[in-house]
């Protein structure tokens, strides 16, 4: 007799970010995450991509990574500038840890249409 599982057969859902399974973040929560990136000494990086290519292609940098940046308001203004320039793109904030040479965190700030 074949085994009948009681667990549903759920499809894996692709997510774009670290917090993809949580409710969308508020503006204050986004600011707190950016402040955390800066406090850890990580380099803020802004990336963007059209939604149609978000899973198949590399995301493009908005300018260069902000190495050594300590000003939260400057990072937020660059996020907003990227969103204004590419309103239909996903815009993601990445905290790059130079010591481990990896992403410390990544989350979508603006979702494209």
Swiss-Prot record:
Recorded superkingdom: Bacteria
GO terms for MF: ribulose-bisphosphate carboxylase activity
Pfam family, one: RuBisCO_small
Disulfide feature: none
Intracellular or extracellular location(s): Carboxysome
InterPro entries: RuBisCO_ssu, RuBisCO_ssu_dom, RuBisCO_ssu_sf
UniProt keyword terms in alphabetical order: Bacterial microcompartment, Calvin cycle, Carbon dioxide fixation, Carboxysome, Photorespiration, Photosynthesis
BP-aspect Gene Ontology terms: photorespiration; reductive pentose-phosphate cycle
GO cellular component: carboxysome
Subunit structure: Heterohexadecamer of 8 large and 8 small subunits. Forms a CsoS2-CsoS1-RuBisCO complex.
Family, similarity comment: Belongs to the RuBisCO small chain family.
Miscellaneous comment text of the record: The basic functional RuBisCO is composed of a large chain homodimer in a 'head-to-tail' conformation. In form I RuBisCO this homodimer is arranged in a barrel-like tetramer with the small subunits forming a tetrameric 'cap' on each end of the 'barrel'.
Function: RuBisCO catalyzes two reactions: the carboxylation of D-ribulose 1,5-bisphosphate, the primary event in carbon dioxide fixation, as well as the oxidative fragmentation of the pentose substrate in the photorespiration process. Both reactions occur simultaneously and in competition at the same active site. Although the small subunit is not catalytic it is essential for maximal activity.
Annotated protein name in UniProt: Ribulose bisphosphate carboxylase small subunit
Protein's organism: Prochlorococcus marinus (strain MIT 9313)
